[in-house]
Each structure stands twice: as structure tokens, then as C-alpha cells.
């Protein structure tokens, strides 16, 4: 049975750990609020980008651009898992990596070659440990991603796609639902779906009322410049979703850790009180026994 002093040391240690987990919970909550604000701020830009591409696409007579090329035979696929640079976030990193490997198994069963582009230290370390060859690794920014980070990733995957090294690019990341819920998502980002160039009847009617636009340069050239920006925006949105998911998962994990620490402190305190009671009882018995021996 543990002594009173040993139990006191354990209680002190757990209390110190609880202070750390509470601090981490507060930091994660603050970062989560900022991430939510950035996601909200991006939405109008992303929606306008979609409208702009659709409008230019309607004006283009023919669209044959590398990023839109749908290849008949898919021989190689690049998987891009978005993970964090740090742990202590519950199952946040594990579920992305697990889904990415499930996608890999499915592709390999079809005879497709898989290439990897890692985002986040946790993903990179797991892929390296499993001896996967990386076609790119982007680290050190997952807490607060910048648009430049999305540009770098977009440039690399576009390079692989246009060079014919891969025929498809799949993004695997956590979509932010709430602080308690993160949903693993697979998204094909290359080739860009031609659906973004399609419009409904209302939009076509609105174009008719506005009349014909004069484009300078030609619509095809504008679209060629817009599509890479569209790809960057899609990746940036996924990075922001992943960041919010990570902070939500970390906040929840640290809250649970603090709760468990409190319960452990209560249990250890009860054990310490019982141990102290047993020591006092033993001392009383020894005193009484000594007094009886003298009588």
C-alpha cells in the first residue's frame, strides 16, 4: 500500500499536469475562434471566385486547359493528407492518416501507383516511418496557415499533374463541423471538375439581360489564369478547415484530460486519507499496547 507521502507526491504531480491541460485548452479555444473567423472571411472570396470562373467559362468558345484535362486511364494518383505539426489533439491526426492509407489500398487494388505529398509533421513522420516515398513535404504552418502555403502546395501538385507524373490528386483532411465533431473528407482537386464552368438557367438569363461583355484578354486566357487561383483557394480552404478541426479536437481532448485529472485527484485524496487514518490507528494501538505492557 502506498504511503501518505507517496500519495501526496502523486496528487501534486497530477495537479501540475491539470494546470498544463487547462492552459492548453484555453489556448486551443482562442486559436479555434480565430480559425472560425478566417473560414467565415474566406467564404465571400471563394463564392465570388466560383461566379467569376463560371461567367468567364460561359463566354469561352472552347476550353482546353491542362488543369481541366480528364484522362481516360488513371495510372498514378497523388494523395495529400493534411495533418498537424503537433499531437495532443485526440484522434485528429490518426483518422486522416487512417483514411489516406485506406485510399491507398483501394487504389493499389486497382493497379494504380500512389504518390504522396505530406502536409504537417505528423503525416510526414508516419509516411517516412512506413517507408513511403514523398513527392513533397510542407511543414511548420498548420497552426496558422497562410495563403502562400496553399500556393506552394498547389504549385507542386499542379507540377506533378501537368508533367503527367500523376493523373489525379486527392486531398484528405478533416472538415470542421464543431469543436466536438470533425469529419474526414476526401476531395479530388485535380483535374479540376468542368462542372464549375456550368451555369443554371437563371444565370444565363441574367447574362442575357446584361448584354454581351467585352473581354480583354480573351476568355480562354483569363480562365487559364483563374484556374490555378481557384485550385489555391480550394487548398487554402481545406487548410483552414483542418486548422479549425485540429484546435477543436485539441480543446476537447484537453478538457477531457483536465476532467480525468480532477477525478484522479479525488481518488488519490481518498486513498491518502485512508492511509493517514490507518497510520493514526496503528500509532494509537502501539501507544495503548505500550501502556498496557507497563501496567
Predicted feature locations:
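C-terminal beta-strand-loop-alpha-helix "lid" module of Rossmann-like NAD(P)-dependent dehydrogenases
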Residues: 1-295
Amino acid at each position: 500500500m502506498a504511503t501518505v507521502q507517496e500519495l501526496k507526491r502523486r496528487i501534486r504531480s497530477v495537479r501540475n499536469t491539470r494546470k498544463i491541460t487547462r492552459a492548453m485548452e484555453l489556448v486551443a479555444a482562442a486559436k479555434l475562434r480565430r480559425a472560425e473567423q478566417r473560414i467565415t472571411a474566406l467564404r465571400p472570396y471563394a463564392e465570388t471566385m466560383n461566379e467569376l470562373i463560371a461567367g468567364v467559362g460561359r463566354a469561352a468558345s472552347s476550353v482546353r486547359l491542362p488543369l481541366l484535362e480528364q484522362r481516360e486511364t488513371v495510372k498514378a494518383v497523388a494523395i495529400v493528407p493534411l495533418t498537424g505539426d503537433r499531437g495532443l489533439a485526440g484522434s485528429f491526426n490518426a483518422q486522416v492518416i487512417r483514411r489516406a492509407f485506406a485510399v491507398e489500398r483501394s487504389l493499389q487494388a486497382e493497379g494504380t501507383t500512389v504518390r504522396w505529398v505530406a502536409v504537417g509533421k505528423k503525416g510526414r513522420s508516419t509516411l517516412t516511418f512506413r517507408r513511403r516515398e514523398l513527392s513533397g513535404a510542407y511543414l511548420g504552418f498548420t497552426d496558422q496557415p497562410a495563403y502562400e502555403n496553399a500556393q506552394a502546395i498547389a504549385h507542386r501538385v499542379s507540377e506533378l499533374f501537368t508533367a503527367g507524373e500523376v493523373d489525379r490528386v486527392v486531398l484528405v483532411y478533416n472538415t470542421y463541423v464543431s469543436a466536438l465533431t470533425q469529419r474526414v473528407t476526401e476531395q479530388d482537386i485535380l483535374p479540376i471538375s468542368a462542372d464549375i464552368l456550368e451555369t443554371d438557367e437563371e444565370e444565363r438569363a441574367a447574362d442575357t439581360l446584361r448584354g454581351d461583355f467585352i473581354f480583354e484578354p480573351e476568355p480562354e486566357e483569363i480562365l487559364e489564369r483563374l484556374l490555378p487561383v481557384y485550385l489555391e483557394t480550394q487548398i487554402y480552404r481545406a487548410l483552414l478547415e483542418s486548422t479549425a478541426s485540429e484546435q477543436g479536437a485539441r480543446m476537447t481532448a484537453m478538457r477531457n484530460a483536465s476532467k480525468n485529472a480532477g477525478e484522479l485527484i479525488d481518488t488519490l485524496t481518498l486513498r491518502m486519507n485512508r492511509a493517514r487514518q490507518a497510520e493514526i490507528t496503528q500509532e494509537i494501538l502501539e501507544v495503548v499496547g505500550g501502556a498496557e505492557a507497563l501496567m
